[in-house]
A protein has these predicted regions:
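Transmembrane helical hairpin unit
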Residues: 12, 18-19, 43-45, 60
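Transmembrane alpha-helices and immediately adjacent membrane-cytoplasm interface residues
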Residues: 1-25
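Short cysteine-rich clusters marking metal-coordination/redox-active sites
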Residues: 113-117, 130-134
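Short Cys/His-rich "knuckle" micro-motifs
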Residues: 122-128, 140-145
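ATP-binding catalytic core of ATPases
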Residues: 49-51
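A broadly conserved sequence feature marking short terminus-proximal activation segments
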Residues: 53-109, 145-146
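Membrane-cytosol interface motif
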Residues: 22-42
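Flanking scaffold residues of small Cys/His-coordinated metal-binding clusters
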Residues: 108-112, 126
Length: 149
């Protein structure tokens, strides 16, 4: 009985105090916005890109340009909101590393994505570029794959 009353009291307080609710339950965190990974937010939540990409693959995501918004919910699940096919943009492939090639020197002109933070940039053959967002030097060819449902 005491536990039930304590639980009801806490739930009532949380219903009347947003700060207390945030303290006890946490806040949902936007981890992908407009196809761009917020890797610093993932790391703050002690989640690696590998774990996150696995969760996205389970949700039929092949590349980040398919994702308009992804939210790490307070219960650990990931909510994914997709672009319609006609709005899908080039993005970082989230297939496992052995399925994609990484470059420090760009082999041919095209659109490439930083393998760490997912920023997408046009690059020329022979170019060696440090990512302006995260200072990483590795790039992969950006994917334009649409979702298959």
């Amino acid at each position: 009985v005491t536990l039930a009353l304590l639980y009801r009291g806490i739930m009532w307080l949380m219903g009347h105090s947003e700060k207390l609710e945030d303290l006890l339950e946490g806040k949902p965190i936007v981890v992908v916005e407009e196809g761009q990974l917020a890797w610093e937010k993932l790391h703050a939540e002690n989640m690696t890109e590998f774990e996150f990409f696995m969760e996205l693959r389970v949700n039929s995501v092949e590349q980040l340009g398919q994702v308009r918004l992804a939210i790490l919910e307070t219960n650990g699940q990931i909510s994914v909101f997709y672009y319609p096919d006609e709005e899908v943009r080039a993005g970082l492939s989230i297939l496992p590393a052995h399925c994609t090639t990484r470059y420090t020197t760009i082999p041919q002109e095209g659109i490439y994505a930083c393998v760490r933070c997912s920023i997408v940039m046009a690059m020329q053959a022979g170019e060696k570029r440090i990512c302006p967002r995260c200072a990483n030097a590795e790039w992969s060819k950006a994917s334009r794959a649409k979702r298959l449902t």
